[in-house]
Amino acid sequence: MGIVEGITEWLPISSTGHMILVEQVVKFNASEEFMSMFRVVIQLGAILAVVVLFWNKLWPFGLRHGRVCSKPAVWQLWFKVVAATLPVLIISPLDDWMEAHFYNYITVAAMLILYGVLFLVVENRRTTPRVTKLEQISYRDALLIGVWQCLAIIPGTSRSGATIVGGLLLGLSRACVAEFTFYLAIPVMAGASLLKVVKFVVGGSVMTGTEVAVLAVGCVVAFVVSLAAIRFLMDYVKRHDFKFFGAYRIVLGIIVLAVAAATAIF
């Protein structure tokens, strides 16, 4: 699952859509409370990969003539990331309710197919992007991308998929929206992980030694695989569009529906 998380968290193909299939094949001898927490906290490894790869662009301090100085452009970037995170904070209380009512084959398959079609439509109507550099992203752009990010609360949507579609519609270049999407993940995924851990502990649950080991290994694997996935996507979007991912999502959605039908029959 660490491999699945590391790949699917950054590519706009829905980590949930893949997780729901993996869980059909790989049966974990763990409580549902742990699995609910595990699916989210494993993202910490993926977040660390972003920090490592983009450290120079994310750290707001530097050295000039032997003295520590601030980087205004980096601070501006972080303020825009915060602006994009605000809509998520508003809807975050609905997260557990959405998972309880919509974490199922039909919802996941529907979102996979819907956003697959959206990718194809958006790419077919693409014009020359008006934003090609991160510093050109306005606070309005950031806030609207944050609104698109809220749609990822529906299982099967894909956080990166929603923000990339939103960014493309707003006129961001593929490389620009992909990189900004990576940065948005840091506060959102870190906050979601912390919230899941707190709920797990407050709920009276305790991890076994095996579960601690599983979580640790999952995070490490997600980190390593994320390094490769992020590098791949940044290189890919410089030369290609997102149509392949749109088609992939549609095919995966059909597979999820087939698995749902087979599960219901057998």
Q: Would you name each region that the model predicts?
A:
Residues 1-266:
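Multi-pass membrane proteins that catalyze or facilitate reactions on polyprenyl-/lipid-phosphate substrates
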